[in-house]
Amino acid sequence: MDIKRTVLWVVFSFSLLMLWDNYNRYTGKPSIFFDNPTTQAAKPAAATDDGKTAAAPTADVPTSSAHAANATGVPDSVAPTKSEIVTITTDLIKADIDTVGGEIRHLELLTHHESSDSTKDIVLFDSTPPRTYLGQTGLIGGAYPNHKSLFTVRPGPRSLEAGDQVQLVLEAEQNGVKLVKTYTFKRGEYKIDIKHDVINKTAAAINPSLYLQLVRDGSKLNNESMFYSTFTGPAVYSDSDKFQKVTFESIEKGKIEHVVKAESGWIAMVQHYFVSAFVPPANVPREYFTKKLATNLYAVGAIMPMGAVAPGATQSMDATLYSGPQESKRLEAVAPGFELVKDYGWLTIIAKPIFWLMIQIHQLLGNWGWTIVVLTIVIKLAFFPLSAASYRSMAKMKLVTPKMTEIRTKYKGEPQKMNAAMMELYKKEKINPLGGCMPIVIQIPVFISLYWVLLASVEMRNAPWLWISDLASPDTLFGSYMIGSFHLTIGILPILMAISMFIQTKLNPTPPDPIQAKVMMFMPIAFSLMFFFFPAGLVLYWVVNNILSIAQQWTISKKMGIVN
């Protein structure tokens, strides 16, 4: 029996199945294996890529359990007749704050550009149809100022200029309760400090709660690939329950799949490479919530009681808003556990050391492309003994292939006798039929981890290497073409990938089964077509790894007299 070929056949079949499953998820059809977090994006009334906008929210002011009995929503009639957009510009971000609610309605990352158009900045918060992505704060517990109230703006600078920070102060008063929001933007930071001062001008004590809320449509990202899937949606973190992702689909179904009450943590909206998050003050009780606001419009937030505010008194509560790239050092400085938004899959314990090693290599080389090349060499050297054992086993299998063919011919139709003869041959030639598989299986977790590191690292975006201008995008050396609804890019790396895989199949033992032999010949073509859609950084890793594997396997085969 040829166990290695059986394993490869299973791997190939599973790859095709996963490819089909990703295609289903990309086109909005139900997934075979996973929940589809973007199902709602396909609804006609949703904010989709066809230009249709999400319905306006009808009850988007949150309510905590403490105020449920006397909760008062904000009626549409209180909407102000006039609003003003205030733009704040720093060295890293450009933010538009609306005087209606003092909410952030637009935020650009000035040093990160669209892969498809380098003249356009990455936009996170956005209120331009069909997009809806907002950062909102306000008070509940009474008819107090919230994200629907009209704020006035204090005069002041709107850019850093010569300083290291700029502040924007907004004020709103309702029923004798005044809310003062102070946004502080700092040079070199994606963090925005937000101070909330509640001033009680009434004759009685009040007990307001502060809410922090992120609102986003559930539509797919424009640059989402059908060949690999990354998470887009809300996330909640607490010290007790750690990092919890919440799909738009689960919110649509009314499921609560996260911690509700905690003493610490944060809430976020996560997407590939970027994240926006509100971080409440530490050691303050809070309620987390996720909910559907309208068709294809969802919210995640936190509610914190501010305590009793006596007449004439002022109560304050700070919060931090981070809206920017998933750069590990920046994430670690925001809040405990915040680095977990950088999704390395279920092998984080292996992926994090690999990324740390990448950082060290990059500090020496200064180029992410060469970093990938050197990292691949380092990992290949680390697994050299295991790989050598695997290749020696495959070389032995190739040496006895003629004898195996004779046994199959001799005992055709007699599987028990054939298997017994095969076992006797393995014993005589001192061959372990699993010897070529087990060393490879042991390495699989590391290779999967490296895959996720390269896929999740925002550092790859717009990073050049030789002819490649962006390691996070497909190689486009030979052009880019539209085939129906597919955007096909033709590059040299996927072609080199196919060539290297073809050479590897020639070095491996030829499968005795004609069908398996044809499948093994077809695999390089199938995988190269798939890799035309993958980020160049990932394909670069596979090409370098294949070249090193070919060199090692050829050397071992030559020493054993299999190749000339």
UniProtKB/Swiss-Prot annotation:
NCBIfam families: PRK01318.1-3, PRK01318.1-4, yidC_nterm, yidC_oxa1_cterm
Pfam families (UniProt xref): 60KD_IMP, YidC_periplas
Intracellular or extracellular location(s): Cell inner membrane
Low complexity composition bias: residue spans: 43-60
Principal location class: membrane
Keywords, alphabetical: Cell inner membrane, Cell membrane, Chaperone, Membrane, Protein transport, Transmembrane, Transmembrane helix, Transport
Top-level taxon in the UniProt lineage: Bacteria
Annotated spans, Disordered: 43-76
TM spans (from-to): 7-24, 293-313, 341-361, 364-384, 438-458, 483-503, 524-544
Family named by the database record: Belongs to the OXA1/ALB3/YidC family. Type 1 subfamily.
Native source species: Janthinobacterium sp. (strain Marseille) (Minibacterium massiliensis)
Function text: Required for the insertion and/or proper folding and/or complex formation of integral membrane proteins into the membrane. Involved in integration of membrane proteins that insert both dependently and independently of the Sec translocase complex, as well as at least some lipoproteins. Aids folding of multispanning membrane proteins.
GO MF annotations in UniProt: membrane insertase activity
UniProt-recorded name of the protein: Membrane protein insertase YidC
Membrane topology recorded in Swiss-Prot or TrEMBL: Multi-pass membrane protein
